[in-house]
């Protein structure tokens, strides 16, 4: 899910997010999950994302703690919902113009396959894909290590803010999915011969995130 409630360029939760999730908190839901919280500020989806602070400097936990509290704010007498933060790296689906990078800078992805490049579409559709999405820059091992660290840092932020857990966004198109996908995995990772090998990075992110 994507709320489109942040400023252009993304940022922490604001009063619009608090109002939305406070309303949902009174709905007697068992679990409430945030929209995708981007672990990389240079890989946004539609430009107004929730974005984690940098791993490499001081940060303000208050906006995230306020969001967690809002998600737990059930009506009197009701059991509070569990609050999960959904962590995401948009990868190759981060668009040219509102993706958090200069329009000429390509996003990082496990392979150089551009969004829409393997579809049998009309000429106009192919041109639209070309206009909206760059051919990605293939991730190095260092880039992969950074992505793992970013997910783990997100888990740390979630725990510190008072969330009950995290959800790792693994749907089609996003980095977490592509890292273990046979057709879009990084070329430096040997061809998987078993389910365990295909999911080695997924498992690494999961284990390291759980450790946080």
Regions from the language model: what does each represent?
Residues 32-36, 80-87, 161-175, 212:
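Short beta-strand segments at enzyme active-site cores
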Residues 49-81, 179-212:
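Alpha-helix-loop-beta-strand connector modules within alpha/beta enzyme cores
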Residues 63, 67, 140-143, 147-150, ...:
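General structural feature for long, well-ordered alpha-helical segments within catalytic domains
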């Amino acid at each position: 899910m994507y709320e489109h409630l942040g400023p252009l360029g993304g940022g922490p939760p604001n009063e619009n997010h608090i109002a939305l999730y406070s309303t949902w908190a009174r709905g007697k839901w068992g679990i409430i999950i945030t929209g995708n919280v981007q672990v990389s500020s240079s890989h946004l989806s539609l430009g107004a994302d929730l974005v984690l602070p940098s791993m490499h400097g001081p940060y303000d936990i208050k906006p995230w703690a306020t969001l967690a509290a809002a998600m737990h704010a059930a009506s009197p007498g009701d059991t509070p919902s569990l609050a999960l933060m959904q962590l995401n790296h948009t990868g190759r689906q981060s668009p040219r113009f509102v993706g958090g990078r200069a329009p000429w800078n390509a996003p990082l992805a496990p392979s150089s396959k551009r969004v829409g490049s393997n579809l049998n579409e009309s000429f106009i559709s192919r041109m639209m894909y070309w206009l909206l999405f760059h051919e990605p820059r293939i991730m190095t091992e260092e880039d992969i290590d950074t992505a793992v660290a970013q997910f783990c840092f997100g888990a740390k932020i979630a725990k510190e803010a008072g969330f009950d857990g995290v959800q790792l966004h693994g749907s089609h198109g996003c980095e977490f999915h592509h890292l273990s996908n046979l057709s879009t995995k990084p070329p430096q990772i040997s061809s998987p011969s078993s389910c365990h090998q295909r999911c080695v990075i997924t498992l690494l992110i999961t284990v390291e995130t759980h450790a946080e």
